[in-house]
Amino acid sequence: MTPQELKSILSSGLLSFPVTDFDAAGDFDAESYARRLEWLAPYGASALFAAGGTGEFFSLGLDEYPRIIKTAVDTCAGSVPILAGVGGPTRQAIHMAQEAERLGAKGLLLLPHYLTEASQEGVAAHVEAVCRAVKIGVVVYNRNVCRLTPALLEQLAERCPNLVGYKDGLGEIELMVSVRHRLGERFAYLGGLPTAEVYAAAYKALGVPVYSSAVFNFIPRTAMEFYKAVAADDQVTVGRLIDDFFLPLLEIRNRRAGYAVSIVKAGVRVIGHDAGPVRAPLTDLLPDEYERLAALIRKLGPQ
């Protein structure tokens, strides 16, 4: 798949990031992960991102990363494109990017570098180095310490033909408008805030109709229903699901730092597709929080 073909795929439809399955000992469970992907693939996501933020990229070992990507690519071959999360220090990100390309990933999501503060020029050099190390398409994730300006994104777009996507995890409307205006059709634009459904209608009005859905992991039918309602400007359906599900979900998610991932793993457990616990430093939901989530999910009906 060429970078431009990837850009075309990412320019429409719903995206998602499967959780990564761990066994009781906390090790990667390839068989359970494959079953998860087999279950999710038919629901109609345009692409799935293996080892993304919701997939606990930040806690994955370099030894298990290739197994995760290979399992995803092999399981979804011919059904849905797999993009791989990459990140960390520049050399590590390059190593992961090349491994993912070798294993058949159709593209990469370049997650923010870890902790280290860096200048705009330093972050741009990091992004460029990863892009130049592979031929497949790359999506850069503007979030946390990775805050590229429209001017630098434009320079990167000129120097890196395979940089084809921009994912926004900052939620700064002025910046998003500026990036969209300056780069035009050069990129595919993805909404990437946690529980992106809450912001979906607003981002669509900015010219960003595509977003990644974490809840697709455990309520894929409802996630697709919501996406289609936003696309069709069906404000009745959007409002109903926001009020009945997403806002109550946020009340649970916002109780503790890290729950944006923990609540997804709890959700898949509720529906009978348990992926095991989250890895430290994240913590699982407390029992009362889990029961509140389960009640919300049950109200939505079969998925």
Curated annotation (Swiss-Prot):
Q: In which pathway does it act?
A: Carbohydrate acid metabolism; D-glucarate degradation; 2,5-dioxopentanoate from D-glucarate: step 2/2
Q: Which family does it belong to?
A: Belongs to the DapA family.
The record's annotation in SMART domains points to: DHDPS
- The name this protein goes by in its record: Probable 5-dehydro-4-deoxyglucarate dehydratase
One annotated GO biological process: D-glucarate catabolic process
Reaction catalysed by this chain?
A: 5-dehydro-4-deoxy-D-glucarate + H(+) = 2,5-dioxopentanoate + CO2 + H2O
UniProt-listed NCBIfam families? KdgD, PRK03620.1
| Key words, A-Z | Lyase
Return the Pfam families for the record. DHDPS
Does this UniProt record's set of keywords contain Lyase? yes
UniProt GO MF annotations? 4-hydroxy-tetrahydrodipicolinate synthase activity; 5-dehydro-4-deoxyglucarate dehydratase activity
Q: What is its EC number?
A: 4.2.1.41
Top-rank taxon = Bacteria
